[in-house]
């Protein structure tokens, strides 16, 4: 998988450089109105303009299909930048190897708009799935298959895939949920935390497969994931404290005798409610985008410097970053799940009753004494 990914990225950069070369030749045809023999070349090149791929760079009318395709006319550097953006941005075209244009090719394209047509268009609302949405569907289906396959092989002595899944689930429950939420309340939120962990993990790993895409490098996806945590956190807080206690919590623990300070504390505490999902959103998005940009930049050095000798240094470095991305895929899934449990646990604790809450958990289960109370207090709303 590693070698295939690097070869795929290198071929993409090479194709972009090759397609960008004839672009300046089309300018004199439009500006000076060259004779018919000279104009025949661009017409022949633009014939397959209805298709995506090389015709996008040659025919300006189809530039809208590929975002920054017009940037190829600007020169060599812009073409490399366009390829880098193409690998991390969303779209309606999925590239894949297969049989297309009458021959086997590695750069065939699946246009989702042609597949779904007008079936998911309702007036101005276009519900046609994009590339990243398809990746989420694929990841969800694969996750369901893996979990069901693991459960079917359940035995008294866990082994193989079932053992691996069980270890991860137990880790999320015991080391993340129980430690940050408390043993008394953890089991209510374990299903969400386990689902979030595996879903993000599969999305991160999908982005490392050749011809796939990283959905977690889409800001809309990370916002949606963080929004789920935000809503669950507010639900847990209102259920634990009631509406009155929840609203009183926005005063930041300032007593009524200092009520004028509420003018300052309430806006601060209110903004604090949204800094937590914002941190979840940006952290996951930035980490997943950064790794892919580094790999593409290292491979792009081969074409930017115009010499194959650079590959002896850039390819091993890109391979190292790729292996690091495998580790990052697990780390980011863990961090998102851990922070989500931390925020949920903080929502269950009233700002002024941290010690009492800790004492309750001290009797609820082992290892849940004042340490849990101080841990949650440090993450209470308004201090994140």
Swiss-Prot record:
SUPFAM superfamilies: F1F0 ATP synthase subunit A. Keywords: ATP synthesis, Cell inner membrane, Cell membrane, CF(0), Hydrogen ion transport, Ion transport, Membrane, Transmembrane, Transmembrane helix, Transport. Its main location: membrane. The keyword Ion transport applies. GO terms for molecular function: proton-transporting ATP synthase activity, rotational mechanism. One of its GO terms (cellular component) is proton-transporting ATP synthase complex. It is found in: Cell inner membrane. CDD domains: ATP-synt_Fo_a_6. The keyword Magnesium does not apply. PROSITE patterns: ATPASE_A. Residues 22-60, 355-384 are annotated as: Disordered. The chain crosses the membrane at residues 131-151, 189-209, 218-238, 258-278, 293-313, 319-339. It is a multi-pass membrane protein. F-type ATPases have 2 components, CF(1) - the catalytic core - and CF(0) - the membrane proton channel. CF(1) has five subunits: alpha(3), beta(3), gamma(1), delta(1), epsilon(1). CF(0) has three main subunits: a(1), b(2) and c(9-12). The alpha and beta chains form an alternating ring which encloses part of the gamma chain. CF(1) is attached to CF(0) by a central stalk formed by the gamma and epsilon chains, while a peripheral stalk is formed by the delta and b chains. NCBIfam families: ATP_synt_6_or_A, PRK13419.1. Key component of the proton channel; it plays a direct role in the translocation of protons across the membrane. Belongs to the ATPase A chain family. This is ATP synthase subunit a.
């Amino acid at each position: 998988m590693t070698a295939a990914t690097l070869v795929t990225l290198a071929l993409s950069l090479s194709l972009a450089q090759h397609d960008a070369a004839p672009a300046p030749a089309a300018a004199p045809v439009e500006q000076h109105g060259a004779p018919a023999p000279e104009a025949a070349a661009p017409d022949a090149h633009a014939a397959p303009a209805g298709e995506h791929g090389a015709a996008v760079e040659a025919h300006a009318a189809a530039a809208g299909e590929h975002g920054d395709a017009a940037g190829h006319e600007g020169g060599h550097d812009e073409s490399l930048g366009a390829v880098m953006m193409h690998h991390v941005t969303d779209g309606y075209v999925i590239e894949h190897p297969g049989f297309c244009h009458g021959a086997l090719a590695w750069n065939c394209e699946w246009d989702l708009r042609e597949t779904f047509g007008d079936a998911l268009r309702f007036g101005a609302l276009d519900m046609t799935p994009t590339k990243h949405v398809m990746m989420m569907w694929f990841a969800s289906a694969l996750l369901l298959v893996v979990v069901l396959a693991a459960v079917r092989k359940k035995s008294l002595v866990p082994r193989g895939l079932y053992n691996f899944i069980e270890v991860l689930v137990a880790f999320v429950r015991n080391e993340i949920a129980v430690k940050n939420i408390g043993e008394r309340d953890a089991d209510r939120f374990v299903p969400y935390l386990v689902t979030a962990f595996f879903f993000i993990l599969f999305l991160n790993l999908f982005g490392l497969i050749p011809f796939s895409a990283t959905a977690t490098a889409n800001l809309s996806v990370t916002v949606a994931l963080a929004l789920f945590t935000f809503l669950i956190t507010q639900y847990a807080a209102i259920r634990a404290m009631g509406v009155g206690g929840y609203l009183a919590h926005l005063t930041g623990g300032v007593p009524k005798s200092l009520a004028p300070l509420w003018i300052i504390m309430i806006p601060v505490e209110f903004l604090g409610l949204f800094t937590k999902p914002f941190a979840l959103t940006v952290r996951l998005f930035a980490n997943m985008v950064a790794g892919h940009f580094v790999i593409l930049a290292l491979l792009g050095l081969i074409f930017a410097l115009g010499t194959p000798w650079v590959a002896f240094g850039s390819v091993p470095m890109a391979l190292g970053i790729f292996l690091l991305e495998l580790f990052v895929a697990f780390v980011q899934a863990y961090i998102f799940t851990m922070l989500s449990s931390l925020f949920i646990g903080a929502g269950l604790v009233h700002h002024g009753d941290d010690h009492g809450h800790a004492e309750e958990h001290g009797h609820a289960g082992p290892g849940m004494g004042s340490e849990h109370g101080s841990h949650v207090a440090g993450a209470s709303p308004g201090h994140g």
